[in-house]
Amino acid sequence: MSNRPNSNPGGSLRRSQRNTAAAQPIDHTLAGRNSLSLSVGSLSIPDPDLEAAGTSGQQGRREGSSTRALKRSSVSEPNITFSPSPAKRPKVVSSHFSDSSASGPSAPAISPEVTEPRKAPASVSTKSKKRRLAAEPAPARALSKKSSSYPGPSGASSTPSQKRKKADATLLSSSSSSSLPSSSSAAGPLPPRSEASRAAKPTKLASKSAASAKAGCSTVTDSSSSSASSSSSSSSSSSAATGTNSCAPQGARLKQGKDQSKARRSRSASSPSPRRSSRDKEQSKAAGSSKFDWASRFNSKVNLPKPKLSLPGSAKAETSSKPGPSGLQAKLASLRKSTKKRSESPPAELPSCRRSTRQKTTGSCASTSRRGSGLGKRGAAEARRQEKMADSDNNQDGANSSAARTEETPQGASASSSVAGAVGMTTSGESESDDSEMGRLQALLEARGLPPHLFGPFGPRMSQLFHRTIGSGASSKAQQLLQGLQATGDESQQLQAAIEMCQLLVMGNEETLGGFPVKSVVPALITLLQMEHNFDIMNHASRALTYMMEALPRSSAVVVDAIPVFLEKLQVIQFIDVAEQALTALEMLSRRHSKAILQAGGLADCLLYLEFFSINAQRNALAIAANCCQSITPDEFHFVADSLPLLTQRLTHQDKKSVESTCLCFARLVDNFQHEENLLQQVASRDLLTNIQQLLVLTPPVLSSGMFIMVVRMFSLMCSNCPCLAVQLMKQNIAETLRFLLCGASNGSCQEQIDLVPRSPQELYELTSLICELMPCLPREGIFAVDAMLKKGSAQTTEGAIWQWRDDRGLWHPYNRIDSRIIEQINEDTGTARAIQRKPNPLANPNTGGHLEVRREDARAQLMKEDPELAKCFIKTLFGVLYEVYSSSAGPAVRHKCLRAILRIIYFADAELLKDVLRNHAVSSHIASMLSSQDLKIVVGSLQMAEILMQKLPDVFSVYFRREGVMHQVKNLAESEVFLTSPPKACTSGTASLCTTTITTATTTAASNVTPDLGSPSFQHSMDDSLDLSPQGRLSDVLKRKRLPKRGPRRPKYSPPRDDDKVDNQAKSPTTTQSPKSSFLASLNPKTWGKLGTQANSANSEPSRTAGVSGLARVPPKDSVSNNRDKIKAWIKEQASKFVERYFNSESVDGSNPALNVLQRLCTATEQLNLQMDSGVECLEEISSIVSESDVSSFEIQHSGLVKQLLLYLTSNSERDTISRDERIKRFLHVFFGCPIPGQEPPGRLDPTENGPLLALVHKMNNCLSQMEQFPVKVHDFPSGNGNGSRGSQALKFFNTHQLKCQLQRHPDCTNVKQWKGGPVKIDPLALVQAIERYLVVRGYGRIREEDEDSDDDGSDDEIDESLAAQFLNSGSVRHRLQFYIGEHLLPYNMTVYQAVRQFSLQAEEERESTDDEANPLGRAGIWTKTHTVWYKPVREDEEGCKDAVGGKRGRAQTAPTKTSPRNAKKQDELWHEGVCPSVANPLETYLICDPPEGITFDDPSMEVILLLRVLHSISRYWFYLYDNAACKEIIPTGEFINSKLTAKANRQLQDPLVIMTGNIPTWLTELGKTCPFFFPFDTRQMLFYVTAFDRDRAMQRLLDTNPEINQSDSQDSRVAPRLDRKKRTINRDELLKQAESVMQDLGSSRAMLEIQYENEVGTGLGPTQEFYALVSQELQRADLGLWRGEEVTLSNPKGSQEGTKYMFSSRGLFAVPFGRTTKPAHIAKIKMKFRFLGKLMAKAIMDFRLLDLPLGLPFYKWMLRHESSISSHDLVNIDPGVAKSIQHLEDIIRQKKRIEQDRSHTRETLQQALESLNMNGCSVEDLGLDFTLPGFPNIELKKGGKDVPVTIHNLEDYLRLVVYWTLNEGVLRQFESFREGFESVFPLHHLQYFYPEELDQLLCGSKSESWDVKTLMECCRPDHGYTHDSRAVRFLFEVLSSFDAEQQRLFLQFVTGSPRLPVGGFRSLNPPLTIVRKTFESTENPDDFLPSVMTCVNYLKLPDYSSIEIMREKLLIAAREGQQSFHLS
């Protein structure tokens, strides 16, 4: 982080930046963490193939914190897993390597060559260390030789740092110097510290550890050094021994270990304990090591009940925790003594690394090891069986000691496990610890000559004995302390024991506390907790219990007994510290045992004295309340009822976290009670609705996006299931609230113009759902009866009974097919049993709902009748907004929900109100558009709407339905025999969004709530769209259970368990294959609110949701689905026929029908636009009149033929045309723009201003485009489990947890590379193809063998080639060795494996007939279940180089200068010798075509409209090229051409993370973006540019920066999160430009993000890097460089070396100084080098999201985009306005000369006289004294000998042409060629085609200066850490900033952010946002005496609380002026 401190009022003011915690005490409060956690966080470097979840880790990764100095692992590896036994997938060893690029941080180690240690971060989810080491190559041996302080390999194993940390823990708890953690200490513990001191600072040792770890040295004394050193050998030997393990059970255990470590981290992540971070460090040690039981693995998500199995011998488990045989212990002790010296000095070689290459496996522990384990199939099966039994036994007692576990180990299992044999039977606490100790012993014995292979047969026995011995050491200390705790009567001894117990637990984890006697210690601590008279004992006892739950997560099952005692401390508070500690413990307990707390009355107790606690304790109390509400049942409502008023009042609190916990509490209550109307009314009785309504409209918003969604959804549920609450909300003016949320603050009374505020699709969906539920339900008969068919067939939804299974908390869950398959698999693996039950389905009887309906009318409908004014106000307020949301949304979910809401409004509004409301909306054209949709739901809804409108307003709509094409479309539907039978290839979204396959699944989706006959009228909002926030949402739940058993705080259970069946209800699609696995995966696609499910889900948004609750809803058979679809089609056909018959058959449709008048006029005028006859301009005038004066509809424009005819009229250039094209365009401009008639141009300057008719034409054409286009949108949205994971993050989770199975095969055509014999591999679907190449090449598969070499079996299959690994690491563009094929298709290297398989595999081709992206966004199940064959063969020499994905060299080749070509040489000869220059190209020529341009390959019904709009835009932009003297301006601003519908689709597409990760952008989007960029606004094209131009990590980073809510869920754990490498360089400010050139030379073309630090300054990261680009931009403007035209100026506020330096300035932007033919080559070379550097700098800035501060002119950007051929004299004004004005006068003389010469009346004498009389301001041309040299550059001749040629009236035209050409082209050609060459060495220039020249300044330099208003600042800036928006200082600041002028703004921005300019979008786009925090001082200090300081890395402004606004203004300006160009410590 970069700090710019200003602490001294008058002293030198410095800016500082820093990232290490140790030197930044002032900011600990800012980070919200204590010192220890900061130091740990800054040292936590994410492992490349893992993700860090911590805050510090994230900042370090993103902002380039100082921890980036630590080196990364050496080479990247694809995420590949061996799967030798596909049939037994759960038992397969799977080792994961994550994909990344060839170089970069994301690569896990193949051969770790690391010189500095790295600690595994607290939140990193590591794989098993055994697996890491097994894959580690031999050269790692040398690492220990360097010093006794082990520099652990960062990529391979975390064991060394673990040992170092273990030694820390040993020192803390004991003074013994033994290097083995098992040694107990007789010495006393460290002196205890108070809680305050613990919170205030870390332990000395921990601080020291953190600091020294950074320095790369060990933290402890000699003995710990020896420990660290010897641990290196132990870890390696452990890995070697493990290489012979049996593969099947081992793999399962390794995976579990990883998952459980995740669970531990997530559990402790939110704990407020001050020692959490040090614990986190310890926890990372156990990642992947722990063996743990299946049931507890699933506890956190599936909550399986405890099994009812027992094993012989398990009864004595608890009593056998004594140390093992004393003989072995003594031997080990003596062995340790004798080898102590040896271990202190590094061994010459690590014997543990000696392995047979045959033992190595490709990324697996032992999956393909050729050395057998000695077990046959029978033995392995027995081992697996025994392991399962042990697993299930572990379920029953997670706290048993290690010795007990070892005694349970069956004999048969031991033989299969080698050295780690006991792993399968021991608890997670000791397994890894013991394995590594065993490895250490093995290493020591090998060092003494013991053959390592002896450990194979003897390993299991040795390890069992060894585990007993080692485990006893850890538990003996606890046993001693336990005796102290139980010393009744001796309170001092009990206190001492409690203090020591705290210390033991605070530094321990499951590894170091193996065998800890939880069941004995907890009762003793509970006893101490009840000693009311002794505060210290109670405090330490409660702390110990808290620490125990952090260190040993499973102990919470025992600590739950302490709940009553904890609650006692809250009922009567004697000691506030004890009460707050009790709350901390209860909060941890509530994550898994909330039911126990609730039933003990804990919810009320926690809230009893809420206001007396500190803010952290209050947050804990509210978190407990929220967790208690998670699974509350109606029977338990009384536990929470009394607390509701307090919770309701809490919603008005200032603290954001408290408010969010309270909201979560109510959301869960409403969710659980949604079918209990009386309870919902009680929950909402105490001002809840009012308070939440106020909460929603707070500005700036208090709620995060996820919580906002949850709260709005809660309202929807309440309105849906309790209509009287909807009535209450309507009376509370909820309509205005909703309008505010969708449109922002209203501007006065103008409600006609509706501008939606930016909202995510999920937010829009919930808001429209709420509007829908506020209106009464639609009826169930008549035209709405079909809605029931749009859901699943009712036969499947009305089962009389449902089956349920019970979890550990006693909750019953619906048991459906997916559950069945998953749980069967779990049962098979674990032997788990669980209770099930059968119960009646309350919604089975379809008549029930009907009776309810008869009994009571909907309260909402009553309100509509009783209070029509309120209803009218509601409808008028929201109808227009809803309509706008529908029009501007691309996602089908939102559109369906809007359609339902609009249908409800139209149905219940009376005719007069409807007429008023619909007056300003083109409803008819929208209905016509919907009727042409491919989506059945849209078609049905539009027919229903048309019917209602015709019933209510027949007079109005009988005309409009004809004119807008509704009648035409309905007739088509009525007449179509085969409706929607064969879908088009491209399915479409929006108005036409569903193909038949889509419908197939849509109709089977249990998604609609329109089933009137099934239950209450508003039965559950969440079922009708799978976008629910429920953890029970099937996909996320299944995946969590199956793959990611995190055991931390549960995600909010926001939807009921009944929602579990949603995926099941969404059914197998008819194309699903029959294998169980594939049908399971096929049904994993919940077609949710993004693309499909919601199409079925939301259109029928009537609130009855039976299918969701029916639990056992069956999957309908294919016939049923097809039958339903056919019924719907039949209904549509029938309804359309009735509609036509009823409303349109009675009239005779002839020419007299008034509805056809406009169409007939338009057809007549269009026919006259004939190219073969001259019909004058009358037809154009008629068209202009119709378009601009009448309300001509899109339908009429389409059907009149106007589009096609006008396109031909403007583009045809045939010789047969009677009028030339230019003439026709001028006529068009005359009619539509007011230009003169051709041939009658006036003599003066042409500057027409009337653009009305052309603007109207463009708008009509855009409407046609919106109605006709059918572009598909590929979105991958899944039900969001917790309200946070929106927009595809659930789909990312799917990719996170699934892999593709590929069989690598050598291509049949080649025999000169090795054949892959490793069996199928599992590959990360988002890995790139080049990752497979890297994987194979570093193992020797890329080496071409000589003919005489042996066969494939050379014993080195798995050997990693170190040189190749290093080559991949060091070179970003390594030469490709292998190429890959699927079938006959050659795969591009930069394509993802998923995309390759989906696009090219045979299965994919077969399936493409029956599926598409819309129906199965994740692909058919076959993609995930079948094995895909990928062929590889070596790259031929002639092919090498052309296949590379990197664009650097290719770009250079394309832009190589062509001066040497004969044609070019001839042209230059003519220029120099004869003064002949090329004519200026007319840019219009490239656009005036009537066929699609080269860049367009898609086909769409709207193609002609697109081409016409492209022509109209080019005419608007370049019309002045057709005239001699026209003003250079656009007729219509480009913004008027933006198409809102296409923009919505593009934005929706670009917000889908999965599309970006897979590179699966639709072709229409990229092609339209380049050929018709005017359809999209700049920010959309900017995002499209970043997605297509760079690597996917940059694209993903850009997406996360612009859409932070995507990152709110678990993307830190995601292996698809962006991993951008960062490279740091140190720069000397005195040689800035020189060193910048050097840096760009070295790193310009690197994919790594460049980060800058300055010499003698500590700052690094975002701020200094931003400043680097700004300062280099400034340096490039120095006058002495001679690069630019302009005037020399000095800076107004120079700093350092800037004083006395002159800079170039031009009011219109900088442009290159021209070269003449005689310029010295040395000078040219120097200038060219600078321009080449400028090109690299600009490209690198764009690539790294940095901003330059370089004001370049428009002609410069035209050169960038290769538009130089069309640069003309019009552009001179943007270079030198003075010269441009003079040339304009001279051009006027030329025009006068031409008119005189054309005048036939002149004789030769009078002609000569008239020409000589021409003058400029009274001065003749000859008298001007001009010659043929360039104005302002007398040394540059315009042609050879030009300085001797005077300018006369006769050669004036040649002179002007040459001046323009030399200024804009010839004189600057070499500079721009060098510039392009430099630019293209970074990335190709053609990617900039998305932008216009005038937009490149925004792309490069950000937004231009604009006024800052207080409102914008309030919305975009974030007060924090001491300030709120109401704080005086914040209000002062906004007022001061809003008064700044442009220069002051630049100074302030450079001070705070490092760059003097904001990104496009201003403060809204600043990332991170500007945060104002309070700068604190001692009580004796006056804030007015201090200056503000900043942290540029995170854009923090640390602002003192000044006493007046004048003082603040003064101090801010001083700081901004003086605090530049330095980054030092605060």
UniProtKB/Swiss-Prot annotation:
Record-linked Pfam families: HECT (PF00632)
**Recorded GO terms, molecular function?**
ubiquitin protein ligase activity
Q: Which UniProt keywords apply?
A: DNA damage, DNA repair, Nucleus, Phosphoprotein, Transferase, Ubl conjugation pathway
Q: Where is the composition biased (Basic and acidic residues)?
A: 379-391, 1056-1065
Per the record, what are the reactions this protein catalyses? S-ubiquitinyl-[E2 ubiquitin-conjugating enzyme]-L-cysteine + [acceptor protein]-L-lysine = [E2 ubiquitin-conjugating enzyme]-L-cysteine + N(6)-ubiquitinyl-[acceptor protein]-L-lysine
Q: Which GO terms describe its biological process?
A: DNA damage response; DNA repair; DNA repair-dependent chromatin remodeling; heterochromatin boundary formation; proteasome-mediated ubiquitin-dependent protein catabolic process; protein polyubiquitination; regulation of embryonic development; ubiquitin-dependent protein catabolic process
Extract the InterPro entries matched here: ARM-like, ARM-type_fold, HECT_dom, Hect_E3_ubiquitin_ligase, HECTD1/TRIP12-like, WWE_dom, WWE_dom_sf
Q: Where is this region: Disordered?
A: 1-437, 1008-1123, 1441-1470
According to UniProt, this protein's pathway is: Protein modification; protein ubiquitination
In this protein, the active site sits at 1993 (glycyl thioester intermediate)
Biased composition of type Basic residues is found at: 1040-1053
Enzyme Commission numbers on file:
2.3.2.26
Domain spans labelled WWE: 789-876
Its domain of life reads: Eukaryota
* Bias (Low complexity): 94-112, 135-161, 171-188, 199-241, 412-430, 1068-1079
**Gene3D superfamilies in the cross-refs:** Hect, E3 ligase catalytic domain, Hect, E3 ligase catalytic domains, Leucine-rich Repeat Variant
Q: Which residues form the HECT domain?
A: 1919-2026
Segment K-box: which positions? 1530-1604
Give the CDD domains listed for this entry.
HECTc
Q: Where is the composition biased (Polar residues)?
A: 1-10, 32-42, 73-84, 359-371, 392-404, 1094-1104
Q: Does the keyword Ubl conjugation apply?
A: no
Q: Which family does it belong to?
A: Belongs to the UPL family. K-HECT subfamily.
**What's the protein name?**
E3 ubiquitin-protein ligase TRIP12
Q: Organism source for this protein?
A: Danio rerio
Its gene? trip12
